C-alpha cells in the first residue's frame, strides 16, 4: 500500500479474493457459445484467442518467477545482494490482477473498438506500426508520466507502493495501485487501438506486443544480470533501445534516475541516466560468474507429488505458507507428474534457497527425489550417489557444514551420514544430522512438572537420545512396543534404567510419537493428551477431542536470519526444523566435530547455543 493512499488505490475486486476470475466468465462463456453455434469461418478467432493469451501470459510470468528465484538462490550475477521478507511476498501475491484487467480491456476492445473484430493472423504493416508507436508515443509518454509519479504528491499516494520493493522480483513490475495500472494499460493500448482503427491489426502482432511488454517488465525486475555484453558490442545502438536488469535496478535503489520504460534513450536525452549504470552492469556480469560462496549447505528433498509448487522456486504464494494439501492442486496432476519425471531424470541437486545470518551464508539444496523414492530399495543407491555428490560439491565450494534434512539422513540409507565420512575421511565440511538439537527441542517441549511420558512409534536416533535424556531427568518413559523396549533398554544407563518401562496401558497425558504410529494407537490416548512428534514428518492428526499436537522438532528463527520468505514444508512462517538449525549453529559456534552415525552432541550445549543466538521454542498447539 502507498504511504498515503489516494483515490482508486485498491483493486475493485479485492474482496472477491480467489473468486476474482469470475469477472472474465461472461466473455469466456460468450466465446464458447460463439464456437458452439457458429461455423468455423464465422467465429471471431481474435476474440476466442484472448483466453489462451491470458493463460500464456500467466505461464510466462510464472516461468520468470521460477527462473529468477533459482538464479538468485545461487547468488550468481545477482545485482542487489539483499534479501526479501514475507511482507513483500504478501504485497506482491496479487500480481495476476494486472492480467485480469488486461483481459477485460481486450474483451471490450474486441467487441466495441472499430476494426477490432475478425482480425487476420498476421499483418507486417501492423507489426511495424506497433513497433513505431511503442518506441515513440508510448515510451515518451511513459517517461514523463513516470517522472510525474515521482513528484511527492503522486509518489506518496500511488507510486510508493511499487517502490516498497527495493529488492525486486519479476512480478514486482506489475505491483501498482489500481489507478496507476489503468493508466499504464491505456498507454500500452495506443499501438493496439491505432492498428485497429487503421485496419492493420492482427492476432499474432497483438500477442507478440503483449508478450514483449511482459518479457521486458519481468527481465527488468528479475535482480540478476542476463543480457550478454556481446550484444552491445555487436550492435552499439542497442544500448539506447533496450534496458538491462541492472539499469532498472538502479531506479529502485536510487529512485531519481533511470525513469525509462524499456528504452534508455529517453534517460540519455533528458540527462536522467544514473552515472553508475555501465559500471553496475559490467560488475554484475564480471564479478558474479561463480556461484556465491557458502558456509552451510542444508540438503532437503521433495516430499509429496505437489510439494514442488510449495518450494521457494515454485508458486510464491504457496511457498510463503505452510504446506497443506489443496483440492484444486489435484487438477494439476499432469503437470505434477511431468515435474516428477523431469526431477527424476535430473542428475544433481539444485539450490532452492539462500539465507544469511551474522556473516554466515547458507543455502538449501534439494535432492531431486520425492519421499516415496526413499522407500524403494532399487532407488537407494541412486539417492546415495546424489547425496554424496552434493556433499562433495559443498565441500569443494568451501562449505563448513553440510546438514542432512528429512530422509537424507535415514539410518537405513547412509547410517545418518556416516557412510560419506567413512568414504571421505579427509572431508573438510562437517556432516550434521541434527539429532542433538532435535532431541533437545522435544525434551524442552514437555510441559514443566511432567513426571511420565509415553514413547510410541519407530525408535529412531532422536527417540534414543530423548529417552536417555528423560530417564536421566527421572521422568518415567513408558514404551508401547515390547520389541522396541528390549532394543532400547540396554542403551539406558544402569543407574536410571528403571525409568524406562513397557506397558500397553500407559496413562500419561504426554505422548512422544514418531513414524509408524497408527491411528488406532492414538485413540488409546486419554482426552487432553499432548502429542509431541520426534519424527521428521508430522503425524496424522486423528484426535480432535481436546487433544493437541506440537509441530515436528523446530524453532522460531531470529530477525538476524535474513531472506526468509518461504515456509519450510509444513512449518509456520519464520520457523525452521531443528535439523536445519543444527547445521547453522555448527557454523556459528565453529564446532569441528561431526554429528553422524551414532554420534550425538551434548544436548544441553546445543540447546544453550540455540537460545543464545536468538532461536526460540515454538508455541505448543
From Swiss-Prot:
Q: What terms describe the molecular function in GO for this protein?
A: aldehyde oxygenase (deformylating) activity; iron ion binding; oxidoreductase activity
Lyase: is it a keyword of this entry? yes
Indicate where this protein is primarily found.
endoplasmic reticulum
Domain Fatty acid hydroxylase residue range list: 138-272
Q: Which reaction does it catalyse?
A: a long-chain fatty aldehyde + 2 NADPH + O2 + H(+) = a long-chain alkane + formate + 2 NADP(+) + H2O
Q: What is its EC number?
A: 4.1.99.5
UniProt keyword terms in alphabetical order: Endoplasmic reticulum, Lyase, Membrane, NADP, Transmembrane, Transmembrane helix
Top-rank taxon: Eukaryota
- What residues form the membrane-spanning segments? 99-119, 126-146, 186-206, 224-244, 332-352
Q: What does this protein do?
A: Aldehyde decarbonylase involved in the conversion of aldehydes to alkanes. Core component of a very-long-chain alkane synthesis complex.
Which family is this sequence assigned to?
Belongs to the sterol desaturase family.
Report the protein name in the record: Very-long-chain aldehyde decarbonylase GL1-5
The gene it comes from is GL1-5
Amino acid at each position: 500500500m502507498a504511504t498515503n493512499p489516494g483515490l482508486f488505490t485498491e483493486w475493485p475486486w479485492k474482496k472477491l479474493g480467489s473468486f476474482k476470475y469470475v469477472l472474465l466468465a461472461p466473455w469466456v462463456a460468450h466465446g464458447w457459445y460463439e464456437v458452439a453455434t457458429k461455423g468455423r469461418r464465422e467465429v471471431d478467432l481474435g476474440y476466442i484467442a484472448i483466453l489462451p493469451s491470458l493463460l500464456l501470459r500467466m505461464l510466462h510470468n510464472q516461468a520468470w518467477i521460477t527462473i529468477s528465484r533459482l538464479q538468485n538462490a545461487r547468488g550468481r550475477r545477482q545485482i542487489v545482494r539483499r534479501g526479501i521478507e514475507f511482507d513483500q511476498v504478501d504485497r506482491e501475491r496479487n500480481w495476476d490482477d494486472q492480467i485480469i484487467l488486461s483481459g477485460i480491456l481486450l474483451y471490450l476492445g474486441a467487441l466495441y473498438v472499430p476494426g477490432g473484430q475478425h482480425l487476420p493472423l498476421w499483418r507486417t504493416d501492423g507489426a511495424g506500426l506497433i513497433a513505431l508507436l511503442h518506441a515513440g508515443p508510448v515510451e515518451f509518454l511513459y517517461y514523463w508520466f513516470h517522472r510525474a509519479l515521482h513528484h511527492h504528491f503522486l509518489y506518496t499516494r500511488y507510486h510508493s507502493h511499487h517502490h516498497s520493493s527495493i529488492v525486486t522480483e519479476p512480478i514486482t513490475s506489475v505491483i501498482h495501485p489500481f489507478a496507476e495500472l489503468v493508466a499504464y494499460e491505456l498507454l500500452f493500448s495506443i499501438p493496439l487501438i491505432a492498428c485497429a482503427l487503421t485496419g492493420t491489426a492482427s492476432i499474432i502482432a497483438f500477442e507478440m506486443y503483449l508478450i514483449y511488454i511482459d518479457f521486458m517488465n519481468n527481465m527488468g525486475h528479475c535482480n540478476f544480470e542476463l543480457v550478454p555484453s556481446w550484444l552491445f558490442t555487436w550492435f552499439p545502438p542497442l544500448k539506447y533501445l533496450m534496458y538491462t536488469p541492472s539499469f532498472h535496478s538502479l531506479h529502485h535503489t536510487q529512485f531519481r534516475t533511470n525513469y525509462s520504460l524499456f528504452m534508455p534513450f529517453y534517460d540519455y536525452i533528458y540527462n536522467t541516466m544514473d552515472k553508475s549504470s555501465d559500471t553496475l552492469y559490467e560488475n554484475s556480469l564480471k564479478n558474479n560468474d561463480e556461484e556465491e560462496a557458502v558456509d552451510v549447505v542444508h540438503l532437503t528433498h521433495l516430499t509429496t507429488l505437489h510439494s514442488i509448487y510449495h518450494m521457494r522456486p515454485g508458486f510464491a504464494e504457496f511457498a510463503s505458507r505452510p504446506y497443506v494439501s489443496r483440492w484444486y492442486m489435484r487438477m494439476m496432476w499432469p503437470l505434477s507428474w511431468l515435474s516428477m519425471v523431469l526431477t527424476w531424470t535430473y542428475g544433481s541437486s539444485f539450490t532452492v534457497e539462500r539465507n544469511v545470518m551474522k556473516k554466515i551464508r547458507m543455502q538449501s539444496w534439494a535432492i531431486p527425489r520425492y519421499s516415496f523414492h526413499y522407500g524403494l530399495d532399487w532407488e537407494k543407491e541412486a539417492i546415495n550417489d546424489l547425496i554424496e555428490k552434493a556433499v562433495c560439491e559443498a565441500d569443494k565450494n568451501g562449505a563448513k557444514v553440510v546438514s542432512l534434512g528429512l530422509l537424507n539422513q535415514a539410518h537405513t540409507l547412509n547410517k545418518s551420514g556416516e557412510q560419506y565420512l567413512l568414504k571421505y575421511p579427509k572431508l573438510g565440511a562437517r556432516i550434521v544430522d541434527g539429532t542433538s538439537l532435535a532431541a533437545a527441542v522435544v525434551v524442552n517441549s514437555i510441559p514443566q512438572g511432567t513426571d511420565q511420558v509415553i514413547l510410541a512409534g519407530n525408535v529412531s536416533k532422536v527417540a534414543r537420545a530423548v529417552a536417555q535424556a528423560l530417564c536421566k531427568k527421572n521422568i518415567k518413559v513408558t514404551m508401547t512396543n515390547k520389541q522396541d523396549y528390549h532394543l532400547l533398554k540396554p542403551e539406558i544407563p544402569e543407574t536410571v534404567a528403571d525409568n524406562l518401562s513397557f506397558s500397553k496401558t500407559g496413562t500419561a497425558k504426554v505422548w512422544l510419537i514418531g513414524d509408524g504410529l497408527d491411528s488406532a494407537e492414538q485413540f488409546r490416548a486419554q482426552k487432553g493428551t499432548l502429542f509431541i512428534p520426534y519424527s521428521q514428518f508430522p503425524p496424522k492428526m486423528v484426535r480432535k477431542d481436546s487433544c493437541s499436537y506440537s509441530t515436528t522438532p523446530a524453532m522460531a528463527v531470529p530477525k538476524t536470519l535474513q531472506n526468509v520468505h518461504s515456509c519450510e514444508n509444513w512449518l509456520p512462517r519464520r520457523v525452521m526444523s531443528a535439523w536445519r538449525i543444527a547445521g547453522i549453529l555448527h557454523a556459528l559456534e565453529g564446532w569441528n566435530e561431526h554429528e553422524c552415525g551414532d554420534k550425538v552432541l551434548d544436548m544441553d550445549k546445543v540447546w544453550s547455543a540455540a537460545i543464545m543466538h536468538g532461536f526460540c521454542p515454538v508455541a505448543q498447539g
